[in-house]
């Protein structure tokens, strides 16, 4: 694999020499940092099993190497990456996999280790969505996830990835993560804090990642991280699990943050060792039981993961001073909900008791039941999935609901050819050789729902959202 030149500040190299265990080679560290990062993907098991995915993609000649800490994760090698980017493959467009760095699959593996089965989870710094979607898959779209993102521009990307993967159990918020300890104390069974950090571990992906690096900056970031982990710990219920992770390598932003929390709440913090998380995990194990992953150990990004349990309640923080405002939705009455459910089933949309119908004006939404306890405590950017808009003739079903709720075995499902599916993703109407009989058509490709179409004569009218429409070369190779 080709080398690339990474910028290393001298002070950073000195710091790494001191931080690296004697069992590891500093020369190996430098060599690993100069190698470009291996590509990796995670199969979205909400849509397809790993076995079926491997069978589906077998004809492509992809080399898929299992990632030891994630059963559905694979390093991927492809011959035609330049000809067809991974993000333009049919399987990616329909949400069958997520392009995710292997190291970043570690925190969720830690969160669900030892049979942990949380019902209400918070992802404090969620964008672009790799870990939120991984959490949802581990929960099988049940329970509820609060996915927060401080950056307004990244909330939109977060929602797009959640929608593409067919996820229905997520509520999105846009807050500084330091508010949650006061706003929602002891409300969560598990919390992932993948903290903002100095990014020292990402040089294999970005050779200039350390251009603005300084020891002083690390100290400032660590101060913010301490405030974030303190807030997250307050939001965690007694007995709950908190996973703290970063993509950086210095101890000040990693071990020291966790040790600070332990010193602050000595009777309430229990470190849960990660040495048995996967075969070979002990190679990165610290004396506290954390995983400090230098890039040469597993040939991946540098990363840090700690898991801890809250063993008892801690003193509450002062109540927040902000006002949430009125919640603009109201629950749909049982009789009407039954009528809506019946109409939705007619076009192949079905849901279970984990989701409940709510209404705002002419909009119908499905919210995860597990998030209802947070209504009135935080302001949501987006909650659950938009099911439909009502109009005089019935319902206008929404694309995100089709992707999350439809099953391809519906009587109105219509399988497209590769060329027709590509036209669909380009936002164009489709003219199949033999048009379906039904007026409302569940459009599928590779037996996966990709949208809902209206049949007008021999034409299938495209309803693919404009913001998702793709240009350029797609999976058939035609531009």
UniProtKB/Swiss-Prot annotation:
Write down the Pfam families for this protein, in alphabetical order: Methyltr_RsmB-F, Methyltr_RsmF_N, Methyltranf_PUA, YebU_pre-PUA_dom
Role noted for this protein:
Specifically methylates the cytosine at position 1407 (m5C1407) of 16S rRNA.
Tell me which family the UniProt entry assigns to this protein. Belongs to the class I-like SAM-binding methyltransferase superfamily. RsmB/NOP family.
Q: What is its EC number?
A: 2.1.1.178
Q: Which reaction does it catalyse?
A: cytidine(1407) in 16S rRNA + S-adenosyl-L-methionine = 5-methylcytidine(1407) in 16S rRNA + S-adenosyl-L-homocysteine + H(+)
Q: Which GO cellular component term is one of those annotated?
A: cytoplasm
Encoding gene per record: rsmF
Q: Which PANTHER family match?
A: 28S RRNA (CYTOSINE(4447)-C(5))-METHYLTRANSFERASE-RELATED, NOP2 YEAST -RELATED NOL1/NOP2/FMU SUN DOMAIN-CONTAINING
Q: Indicate what this protein is called per its UniProt record.
A: Ribosomal RNA small subunit methyltransferase F
Q: Name one GO molecular function term.
A: rRNA (cytosine-C5-)-methyltransferase activity
Q: Which InterPro entries match?
A: Methyltr_RsmF_N, MeTrfase_RsmB-F_NOP2_cat, MeTrfase_RsmB-F_NOP2_dom, Nol1_Nop2_Fmu_2, Nop2p, RCMT, rRNA_ssu_MeTfrase_F, RsmB/NOL1/NOP2-like_CS
Q: Where does S-adenosyl-L-methionine bind?
A: 125-131, 149, 176, 194
Active-site feature positions: 247 (nucleophile)
| Superkingdom, natural source | Bacteria
Entry keyword set: Cytoplasm, Methyltransferase, RNA-binding, rRNA processing, S-adenosyl-L-methionine, Transferase
Which organism encodes this protein? Shigella sonnei (strain Ss046)
């Amino acid at each position: 694999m080709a080398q690339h030149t990474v910028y290393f500040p001298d002070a950073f190299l000195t710091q790494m020499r001191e931080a690296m265990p004697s069992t590891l080679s500093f020369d190996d560290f430098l060599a690993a940092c100069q190698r470009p990062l291996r590509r990796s993907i995670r199969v979205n098991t909400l849509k397809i099993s790993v076995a079926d995915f491997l069978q589906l993609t077998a004809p492509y000649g992809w080399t898929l190497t299992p990632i030891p800490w994630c059963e559905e994760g694979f390093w991927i090698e492809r011959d035609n990456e330049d000809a067809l980017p991974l993000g333009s493959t049919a399987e990616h467009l329909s949400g069958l996999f997520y392009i995710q760095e292997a190291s970043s699959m570690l925190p969720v593996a830690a969160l669900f280790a030892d049979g942990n089965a949380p019902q209400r989870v918070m992802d404090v710094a969620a964008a672009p969505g790799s870990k939120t979607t991984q959490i949802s898959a581990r929960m099988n779209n049940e329970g509820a996830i609060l996915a927060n993102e401080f950056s307004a521009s990244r909330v939109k990307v977060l929602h797009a990835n959640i929608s593409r993967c067919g996820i229905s159990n997520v509520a999105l918020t846009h807050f500084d993560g330091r508010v949650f300890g006061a706003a929602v104390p002891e409300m969560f069974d598990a919390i992932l804090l993948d903290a903002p950090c100095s990014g020292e571990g990402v040089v294999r992906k970005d050779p200039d990642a350390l251009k603005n690096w300084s020891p002083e900056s690390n100290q400032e970031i660590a101060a913010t991280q301490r405030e974030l982990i303190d807030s997250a710990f307050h939001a965690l219920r007694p007995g709950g699990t908190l996973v703290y992770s970063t993509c950086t390598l210095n101890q000040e932003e990693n071990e020291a943050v966790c040790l600070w929390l332990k010193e602050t709440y000595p009777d309430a913090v229990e470190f849960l060792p990660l040495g048995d998380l996967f075969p070979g995990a002990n190679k990165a194990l610290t004396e506290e039981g954390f995983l400090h992953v230098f890039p040469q150990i597993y040939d991946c990004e540098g990363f840090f993961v700690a898991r801890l349990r809250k063993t008892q309640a801690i003193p509450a923080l002062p109540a927040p001073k902000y006002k949430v405002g009125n919640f603009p939705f109201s629950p749909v009455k049982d009789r009407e909900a039954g009528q809506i459910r019946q109409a939705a089933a007619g076009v192949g949309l079905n849901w279970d008791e984990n989701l409940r119908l709510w209404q705002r004006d002419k909009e119908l939404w499905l919210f995860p039941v597990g998030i209802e306890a947070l209504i009135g405590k935080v302001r949501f950017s987006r909650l659950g999935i938009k099911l439909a808009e009502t109009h005089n003739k019935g319902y206008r079903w929404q694309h995100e609901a089709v992707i999350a709720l439809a099953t391809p075995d519906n009587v109105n499902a219509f399988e497209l050819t590769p060329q027709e599916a590509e036209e669909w993703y380009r936002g164009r109407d489709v003219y199949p050789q033999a048009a379906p009989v039904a007026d409302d058509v569940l459009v599928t490709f590779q037996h996966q729902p990709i949208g809902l179409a209206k049949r007008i004569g021999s034409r299938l009218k495209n309803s693919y959202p404009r913001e998702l429409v793709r240009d350029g070369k797609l999976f058939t190779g035609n531009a």
